[in-house]
């Protein structure tokens, strides 16, 4: 089970090492290498880490941070339902690495690799494929590999998202506008044929249909843009600042692309975007937490795995 990654600790050095690995990947930033690496090393890695320390400390919790903690908890639950089948975790960037995961299952003949990204994007699932290929090249093992590209229409996944919305008190006692906020990607990547935006739209539409929501009760936005280039729109933060002027004062935000809560959901959505919405005149902002290590999520993962075990 593979997630994106996280610094080893909420300190400047750990954040810098993580960002260097993450932002050096051409899958993440597709600019001429000489230009981008100069910007990265001379500017970004000097300026960004000190600014991110407080943000990471805000969401960190226990020693391993939310992504690693929750991913490991999810893996433990999945493992409890398939005794005899080793379930290990890896991160595309940071620790535990893909190579470390392969070492843990070195005696296996067949491996199911499940990136925890329901919607395929070259910058996420594609990067997992790259990391896997590199780890396999450096491994002495020979494995049959089953790779799960995406599961954005999986019925259990759609139902689990809908149930998480239905459990919200704000949804049960009101008529909030439901906002599906997905991590954005540069528009240029989408224009080059990345299926990600269409898969995001499909997931959101399926959940809205499952909830019997008319089109004027939900919307889709994209968050976490980085740098000056145009990313997928509409932007979540800009939308939050504009909704109260459109007469929408009650929103319920869910982030279907994030399998577990992390900096981008806890700090960016639950705190920053809430502040933007309320400052603009909004009255109630509710964040629906990620599926995390819930049993609903566990059963989705188990069903995906079982299809590959047959």
Residue ranges and their predicted role:
Residues 1-310:
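Active-site-proximal alpha-helix that buttresses catalytic centers in soluble enzyme cores
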């Amino acid at each position: 089970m593979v997630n994106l990654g996280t610094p080893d600790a909420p300190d400047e050095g750990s954040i810098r090492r993580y960002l260097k690995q993450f932002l050096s990947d051409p899958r993440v930033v597709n600019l001429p290498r000489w230009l981008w690496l100069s910007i990265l090393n001379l500017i970004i890695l000097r300026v960004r880490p000190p600014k991110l320390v407080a943000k990471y400390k805000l969401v960190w919790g226990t020693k391993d941070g939310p992504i690693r903690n929750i991913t490991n908890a999810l893996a433990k639950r999945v493992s409890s339902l398939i005794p005899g089948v080793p379930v290990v975790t890896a991160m595309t960037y940071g620790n535990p690495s893909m190579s470390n995961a392969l070492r843990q299952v070195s005696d296996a003949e067949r491996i199911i690799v499940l990136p925890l990204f329901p919607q395929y994007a070259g910058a996420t699932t594609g990067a997992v494929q790259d990391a896997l290929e590199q780890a396999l090249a450096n491994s002495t093992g020979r494995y049959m590999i089953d790779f799960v590209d995406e599961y954005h229409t999986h019925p259990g996944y759609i139902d689990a998202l809908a149930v998480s919305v239905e459990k919200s008190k704000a949804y049960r006692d009101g008529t909030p506008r439901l906002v599906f906020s997905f991590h954005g990607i540069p528009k240029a990547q989408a224009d080059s044929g990345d299926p990600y935006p269409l898969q995001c739209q499909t997931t959101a539409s399926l959940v809205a249909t499952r909830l019997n929501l008319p089109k004027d009760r939900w919307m889709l936005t994209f968050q976490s843009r980085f740098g000056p280039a145009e990313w997928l729109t509409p932007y979540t933060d800009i939308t939050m600042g504009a909704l109260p002027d459109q007469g929408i004062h009650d929103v319920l935000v869910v982030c279907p692309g994030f399998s577990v809560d992390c900096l981008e959901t806890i700090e960016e959505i639950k705190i920053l975007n809430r502040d933007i919405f309320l400052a603009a005149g909004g009255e109630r902002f509710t964040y629906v937490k990620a599926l995390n290590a819930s049993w609903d999520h566990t059963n989705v993962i188990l069903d995906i795995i079982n299809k590959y075990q047959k």
